[in-house]
Amino acid sequence: LNHDILQSKSNTFLSAIHFNTSSKKKSEIGVSFLDVSTGEFLTSQGSSDYIDKLLQNFNPSEILFSKQKRKLFSETFGDNFHVFHLEDWVFQTDYATDTLNNHFKTNTLKGFGIEDISSGIIAAGAALHYLSETRHDKLQHIAKISRIAENEYVWMDRFTIGNLELYHSTSPNAVTLLDVIDKTISPMGGRLLKRWVALPLKNKDKIISRHEVVSYLLKNSKVLDNVKLNIKRIGDIERLISKVATGKVSPREVVQLKNSLEAILPIKEKAQKAKNESLKTIGEQLHNCKLLREKISVTLKEEAPVLIQKGNAISAGVSEELDELRSIAKGGKDYLNGMLKRETKRTGISSLKIASNNVFGYYIEVRNTHKDKVPEEWIRKQTLVNAERYITEELKEYESKILGAEEKIAALELDIFSKLVEWMLQFISQVQQNARLIGELDCLCSFASLAKESNYTRPLLDDTFEIDIKEGRHPVIEKQLPPDTPFIANDVYLDREMQQIIMITGPNMSGKSAILR
């Protein structure tokens, strides 16, 4: 979970592949995708063509498969992936099923809808096994596994994805479709939009439902602006709650999580009041996480540090013992300041300094020019090039008081924070649901903003075989034209009866491929 290497708007998927080489199902392959940073866990199975399309769409950072299947993997999917080989015994049905059931604390996988895809189960079990072997022992945020429904999406092969330049291009500095249409604000929205582009829906009702929300937001610009304003205040709560689960979250990140959850409240209110059923559903399903927000607010200071070891993270009033120790530490430091003033006056050494370091503790530093003024009872502790450092009985006494208090404060703050993080584990599913819903809402707001900015028109969808485009513009090419250069819009009509084929002619660079794309 190193956030320096994680791009906020991209998933970092680990994938596992299982080749079913039994006599009946030689062509069947299982696949799983797991993002430790977000908790997403997906599985499926099918032909090599289907699995190849999944790999192209999910673009995993690493793929696991059996050592014995190296040649088969290379022949089937090529050599352009970063791969890791596991022992063959990991890819057994019983072992994989037990691994998944033990992780999810279930007796069966029926509740996840994957019980009948044995190759997918084996691939999923291999991914979890690999994580357990690589010291990922805290995986409570991986709370469910979902089946990728093959018949719900339009599946594109690697050549189509490449030629359409949906979200990556082989050409340097090329602009992709995602670059043009991505108006998302949150990391969750950015990741989901990429998924939506990679996996276009086939279900007409689901597509129309998205269109209805976009239309509502376009007609109600105040709602759109208000929702976008509050989404801007929301951090990457999906990855933050994953860091809570893995125990790698900082005090500052916990406060960021609390502030993000507070920004969801006005969004929930607006969505619930909307005259659109999909938005209302989002509003109703968003959790207000009141108990979680209040606990964090009471326990941690708003300006909590990045590292708990820095101290001063826990609010006053949380622990009576902590408050008393802080009072002792502060009082001791005040005493040292008073001692400095007193000794400066007594010795006449104006440059006198009382300081401390990790090696020698507290000391009084005197420059060599004033060595003759040092009282006899001071004990030399360290000699420097231009100064001498001394200790006194009085300084020793207060050093032990201050350092003792500071050590206890550090231990107590760490204990309180650790208990808070452990207590927060019960809210993982609620925060994950909020992250998913905010991501969805962010994507829909992005579509509305894009439609408004680019003057896009809502398409009419039906079950006929007609394609009827009026004044169509290619979204990417249009944005790449020089300023004040209009895009020449084109009409396209195709159906099964009258016009099944059209012939496009013209010189080079006249826009033939733009029509095809």
At which residue positions do the language-model features occur?
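A structural-propensity feature for long, helix-poor, extended segments
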Residues: 214, 218-221, 399
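ATPase nucleotide-binding head domains, primarily ABC-like/P-loop NTPase cores
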Residues: 117, 185-186, 190-196, 367-396, ...
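Extended, charged coiled-coil "arm/hinge" scaffolds of SMC/Rad50-like chromosome-maintenance ATPases
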Residues: 384, 388-422
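Cytosolic, long alpha-helical scaffolding segments
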Residues: 267, 292, 299, 362-378
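Charged, surface-exposed helical/loop "interaction arms" that form contiguous linear patches used
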Residues: 246, 250, 260-263, 281, ...
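Charged catalytic and DNA/RNA-contacting regions of genome-maintenance
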Residues: 1-216, 225, 229-232, 236-245, ...
